[in-house]
A protein has these predicted regions:
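Alpha-helical bundle/repeat cores within regulatory domains of eukaryotic proteins
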Residues: 222-267
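Charged (Asp/Glu and Lys/Arg) segments that form or flank catalytic channels of large polymer-
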Residues: 2-18, 22-211
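Active-site palm subdomain of RNA-directed nucleic acid polymerases
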Residues: 34, 217-223
């Protein structure tokens, strides 16, 4: 069995299992179900899948997205750093890619795989579990993954850039010299020797990073670090309105304005 066959079978098994699990939801969404409201009145409702919490690999699995690309939009993997918006992925678009690839493949798993991958769609199943769920767009249902996308993703790269610029030993020394503070973890041996870093450790690093680099990086570098940290913290608001979303956009725009600093210094 090839790797492609194995991955396809795993994905197909997952989607077939989810169909069985969500069959009651599918039936209720299509036919409706009577439920008594808080005032004791009977109402017919049509429940649907509106939210799916998963880390990035699981997001790709459930949404039939090619690994390395965005499960929310159609931006190419080599252009994910772009600030320009791409067309959003939708369930209808993904299903059309799968059906078109199936038609062209003529029962060849390899040909089907290649046709889907060319469009940044995963090729494990012909019929995703969400394809017949009423009112559901799986790409909209996916929630942000703060741990893997921000702390274990963006912030991990940010720390690496800072270590590359000022040196691991220098950054460790600055971290060890920080005074005690309420709510701050003290890394008495620095951070470069840490292995299998947890999300909690990343969060504690984020609290102290800016203080450790603000007088050694160039102003553009400090601004870039601050912009990404602002974005990470703003993204964790429990609720958002148009004002707080504008704060997020401002932080992201600021980073894109000064991000070339890291390229210029050879990170």
């Amino acid at each position: 069995m090839t790797d492609v066959d194995l991955r396809s079978r795993v994905q197909r098994l997952f989607h077939e299992s989810m169909k069985i699990i969500l069959k009651p939801l599918k039936d209720a969404g299509q036919n409706g179900v009577k439920i008594r409201n808080s005032e004791g009145e009977m109402r017919q409702i049509h429940p649907f899948l509106c939210c799916y919490v998963a880390d990035y690999p699981e997001q790709c699995l459930i949404s039939c997205t090619k690994s390395g690309t965005c499960p929310k939009c159609r931006q190419k993997a080599n252009n994910l750093q772009s600030i320009l918006q791409e067309s959003p992925r939708t369930s209808q678009w993904t299903k059309s890619i799968i059906l078109d690839a199936k038609e062209k493949a003529s029962d060849s798993i390899t040909a089907f795989h290649c046709a889907c991958q060319d469009q940044d769609v995963a090729s494990g199943t012909y019929d995703p579990f969400w394809s017949n769920l009423s009112y559901t767009d799986i790409h909209k249902a996916i929630t942000p993954d703060i741990l893997h996308q921000l702390y274990q993703g963006i912030f991990k790269h940010l720390v690496g850039w800072c270590q590359s610029i000022i040196g691991e030993k220098e950054l460790d020394q600055r971290i060890r010299c920080l005074p005690y503070g309420r709510g701050l973890r003290r890394f008495k041996n620095g951070i470069s020797a840490l292995s299998q870093i947890s999300g909690s450790e990343r969060k504690n690093m984020a609290k102290i990073l800016l203080a450790c680099i603000q007088d050694v990086l160039a102003p553009r570098g400090v601004q870039a670090v601050k912009a990404l940290l602002d974005f990470i913290y703003l993204a964790q608001y429990s609720t958002h309105d148009m004002v707080t979303l504008s704060y997020l956009e401002d932080a992201l725009k600021k980073f894109h304005q000064v991000k070339k600093y890291f390229i210029d210094v050879g990170c």
